[in-house]
Amino acid sequence: MEMMEEGVPDVINLSYLAEREETELEKRVAEIIKELGAERLMYCMQCGACASICPLARVGFEWYNKKLIKALILGLRDELLDDPTPWACVACNRCTEICPRRVSPFEVMFAMRRLMAEEYAIGSLAIEGLRSLYEYGHAVYMAGREARKKVGLPEKPPSTESDPKALEDLRKILKQTKLAELGLVPME
């Protein structure tokens, strides 16, 4: 398992908590990914067009779109569950726009996230986003209050950050999810 910082794993893999039969998942990983939203997964011809434009491939993530698709087709489930790449996808959708076979690598990446969530293999990037979502109402930290003021906008955006009741409601919803049971995000 790779480490982001010393002692901090990229992915906290709790797949051993899942109630599914592991061998069945390994046999059917491509079919499961298709069921989770990557309907055209098997149309990929590994041309590399998506990899040529993917920010994840450019910065060195191991299982960027093209490699992820190949690994899914080969059934390399365990290797993928331990990798943070699907959680790092920035959803730019460039891969989908350039794909000559309309595979939608973006959808493959998000289907992989769904599988990882079902298997409790939650990336540290996702956990940090969930912490921020619980604390501030945004999955991504909202910086730039000074910049907002300079251009005449309110200091806080019109979201849960400026609506305490909405933030309270969001926290109630999050407390009712499996996330609360796992205890990965502190919820007072």
Curated annotation (Swiss-Prot):
Name of the protein this chain belongs to: Heterodisulfide reductase subunit C-like protein
InterPro entries membership: 4Fe4S_Fe-S-bd, 4Fe4S_Fe_S_CS, HdrC_iron-sulfur_subunit, Helical_ferredxn
SUPFAM superfamilies in the cross-refs: alpha-helical ferredoxin
E.C. code: 1.8.-.-
GO molecular function: 4 iron, 4 sulfur cluster binding; metal ion binding; oxidoreductase activity
Residue span, 4Fe-4S ferredoxin-type domain: 34-64, 78-109
Organism name: Archaeoglobus profundus (strain DSM 5631 / JCM 9629 / NBRC 100127 / Av18)
Subunit field text: The heterodisulfide reductase is composed of three subunits; HdlA, HdlB and HdlC. It forms a complex with the F420-non-reducing hydrogenase (Mvh), which provides the reducing equivalents to the heterodisulfide reductase.
Binding-site residues for [4Fe-4S] cluster 2, renumbered to this chain: C54, C89, C92, C95
Gene: hdlC
Coiled coil: none
Alphabetical keyword list: 4Fe-4S, Cytoplasm, Iron, Iron-sulfur, Metal-binding, Oxidoreductase, Repeat
Enzyme class: oxidoreductase
